[in-house]
Amino acid sequence: MSAARGAVIWMTGLSGAGKSTLANALHLRLKEAGQAAIVLDGDVLRRGLNADLGFTPEDRTENLRRVAHVAALFMQQGFVVIAAVISPEHRHRRAAREIVGEGFVEVFVNAPLQVCEARDAKGLYARARRGEIAHFTGISDPFEAPLAADLVIETDRMPVNEGVDRLLAHLVTMGRVSG
């Protein structure tokens, strides 16, 4: 499996939906196959590149703009970029698609809110419900579910390896990697 043209897999979903788990599993499979790949994890980027940003609507927009530009740069070098970012609004995902262009794949990593809360080892949802965390997506700020995602992976119903298989099949069908 080698890069035909690279791609950006833009994983969107609530905190705890399984974006990072799926992203890391896909990354491993791509690397094992000799494919240049990188994970851009929203949590990691917020501790580094985007450490100057908060969670206001303006800061979220800027955070995702930066992620999209970095993703596009890697894709142009033949990488499969796996961006695991909440990107809660339709406009954020549209803007990312416009920045990246051809090769953008929107993946809705979906799990019910109750499942996401049950998976939350850090207790962020509980803190948000107590009002200790402002602008928390899914609690005090809305999450706009994608209306036309390229793929939907329901992590409460599908094992990780099956989700990875679906993602790889989609990339092959698109001609972004060879099978």
UniProtKB/Swiss-Prot annotation:
Q: Which residues form the active site?
A: S87
Task: Extract one GO BP annotation from the record.
Answer: sulfate assimilation via adenylyl sulfate reduction
Q: What CDD domains does the annotation carry?
A: APSK
> Any one cellular component term from GO for this entry?
cytoplasm
UniProt catalytic activity: adenosine 5'-phosphosulfate + ATP = 3'-phosphoadenylyl sulfate + ADP + H(+)
Give the UniProt keywords, A-Z: ATP-binding, Kinase, Nucleotide-binding, Phosphoprotein, Transferase
Known EC number(s)? 2.7.1.25
What pathway is it annotated to? Sulfur metabolism; hydrogen sulfide biosynthesis; sulfite from sulfate: step 2/3
> Which positions does UniProt annotate for ATP binding?
G13, L14, S15, G16, A17, G18, K19, S20
Name any one GO molecular function: adenylylsulfate kinase activity
The UniProt function text for this chain reads:
Catalyzes the synthesis of activated sulfate.
Checking NCBIfam families in the record gives: apsK (TIGR00455), PRK03846.1 (NF003013)
Q: Which family does it belong to?
A: Belongs to the APS kinase family.
Name of the protein this chain belongs to: Adenylyl-sulfate kinase
**Native species of this protein?**
Paraburkholderia xenovorans (strain LB400)
What gene name does this entry carry? cysC
